[in-house]
Amino acid sequence: MSRIVEPPTQRQGARRVWSDSRGRIWVAEWNSGNLSMHDPALGMGANSWRTWKAPGADPHVYAVYVDDQDIVWAAEWSNNAMLRFDPGSEKFAVIPMPRPAANIRQILGRPGEVWLPESGTEFISVIKTG
């Protein structure tokens, strides 16, 4: 059986989702420039969602990944950067990409590493986290 989970931000343009160790679902929102989190343990209503505006001018968040330490990583296209979001402090760190127009569409990793395939440059970047 499937069900509809409706984010509270109108026309948010969800692109990618990832879950953390607590079962929360993190959502990259392209149109709104938000990083959102849905906690199914809180039900399906608006109070089960939290939203943070990505830093930078006119942000567009495309991909999201949660690492083994529950740090949330997001690809932000308008400012050609990776965002490191700490859910505990609710703070973003901005990591500029080394090449213009990296256009990261998916993020993966393994313990201590975040892998970033750059569709705009045909390179793969790796951020060491450990």
Predicted segments with their positions:
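Long terminal segments
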Residues: 107, 117-120, 124-129
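A short loop-to-beta-strand structural motif that recurs across blades of beta-propeller domains
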Residues: 34-37, 81-83, 123-125
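Intrinsically disordered, low-complexity linker/propeptide segments enriched in Ser/Thr/Gly/Pro
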Residues: 1-7, 26, 35, 39-41, ...
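Short loop/turn segments that connect beta-strands within beta-propeller blades
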Residues: 39-44, 86-90, 128-130
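A short beta-strand motif characteristic of beta-propeller blades
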Residues: 2-7, 48-54, 91-96
